[in-house]
């Protein structure tokens, strides 16, 4: 498994205009802008974190561009605001190149979650392009 390249499929919190102070507007995931990549993930600052290398992100950008996939990059919300826990760090502990990828979700973990159908389709295209590369 060492040096394998992996996409950790997960969702990303979408910008919520009702709670704008939780996220930085310029680094948040938005509906209708495509598949989301989170280069850095973790909770409580640096606990259980993963940071994808610039080289790996560059390769993924080329794969997505070649596959005509719409994508966006995003960051987590404020430190200690909650959320951000993923399994990417576990895969990275085995020496894999890994980045979180998926769709933006509003109301994550609530009874009624919302996503963009267009983003879901772009994520599908992104995973197909990645597996074909």
Residues covered by each model-derived region:
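Short, glycine/acidic-enriched loop or turn micro-motifs at the edges of active sites
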Residues: 13
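Active-site-adjacent substrate-binding region
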Residues: 16-19, 23-112
